[in-house]
Amino acid sequence: MQKKSLLIIGAVWVEPNSSAAGKRMLQLITQFLERGYKITFAAASQKNEKAIDLISLGIDAVAIELNNASFDVFVKELQPTIVLFDRFMMEEQFGWRVAENCPEAIRILDTEDLHCLRKTRAFCLKKQVPFSVDELLKQDITKREIAAILRCDFSLIISTFEMELLKNTFKITDTILMYLPFLFDEITVKQEKKMQSFEERMHFIFIGNFFHKPNIDAVLTLKNEIWHLIRRQLPKVEIHIYGAYMQQQIQELHNKKEGFIVKGFAEDANKVVESAKVVLAPLNFGAGIKGKLTEAMLCGTPSVTTSIGVEGMADNFPWNGFITNDFSEFALKASELYTNKLIWKKCQLNGIAIINSLYSKEKNALLFFNKIEEIQRNLENHRTANFLGSLLQHQTLQATKYMSKWIEEKNK
């Protein structure tokens, strides 16, 4: 057995230029590589041209199949010391196989964001009813995701809001939860001075992965509710819409006369964000930390967003711009930020303070690996204390296991 080896079971192959989730996964991979781990990345999805070359990083890339005993042979031979599940669906599919074949491996769930929270909010928005915890508790996806969290040795939670929700609403002990936001190098004064100035920047920007429904909704909100109000105050300004997997529905919004410019995939997201003056993100639903907003801070670009956008991202620090759920006020604040250099600069510095205080790679990664070492030293006691997790491992996964075996036989 490798002294330090990690198996990552990915929902998709790693695409850091397409999504915040891809960036997050690459951040985690980098931390394990820096600590001398031998890494194997396995996924059952199709690889495309946007996926990075893992082999060039010294990582073994392995294609696996759902509901197939070949995974048992593979994982038993590999015997990793840690298994990281990329989102709860991967734990549902492969968790029981890992538990059976590698009982000593620490099982970590990277939630990315709480899918149950995002899906329930989308459901409530569609039904035009207010989001409530009661509605969250009714959803099947909530039961599935919470069960996966309980079955793992610990789970990575990306926002402070989600940490509080899991502890207070679902009564999950923080011994099996770990707050781990995005991991960034701190921004130095020298780097801040090199950022493009207020005068050098032009236009508004929105950037996001359009596989992600909150991003589609946000761009439609910009087009239908907000942009005409901004143009009334700033008739020559443009908004540039960037993102991976852009559907025709979004492409058709392009209107040069109105200054609503749909650009498509950005090869270098940093470059386009740091040359824009303001990021607009009118998010009506979603969960977790918003990559577009941390990217804005890293690029020194202030933003206007909603309470959903900022949720769990800034603790008690003043925001990197403005927060409002009212479309008229959103347009006013966007125009103010675009035209007022003093306010713009103050908001830029707020963003730098948030990155350096809350998203420090050095500080957060140290806590993460301390947690791993602590559990490795006391794995048996840690699992004994998580009785509900043991119960679910025993009961729920028996059903999952035999359903999977039935599908396996059926596929032969």
Please tell me what each predicted stretch does.
Residues 2-18, 25, 66, 204-208:
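Nucleotide-activated donor-dependent transferases that construct or modify glycoconjugates
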Residues 15, 104, 109-139, 199-200:
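Acceptor-binding helix/loop patch of EC 2.4 sugar-transfer enzymes
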Residues 80-81, 274-288, 301:
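Acidic donor-binding loop of glycosyltransferase active sites
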Residues 93-94, 142-174, 250:
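A short, active-site helix/loop in glycosyltransferases that binds the activated sugar's phosphate group
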Residues 168, 172-270, 274-275:
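Conserved catalytic-core segment of nucleotide-activated headgroup transferases in glycan assembly
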Residues 292-295, 302-306:
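Short hydrophobic beta-strand element within catalytic cores of glycosyltransferases
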Residues 320-328, 336-341:
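Conserved acidic donor-binding segment of nucleotide-sugar-dependent glycosyltransferases
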Residues 350-412:
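C-terminal amphipathic helix plus adjacent low-complexity
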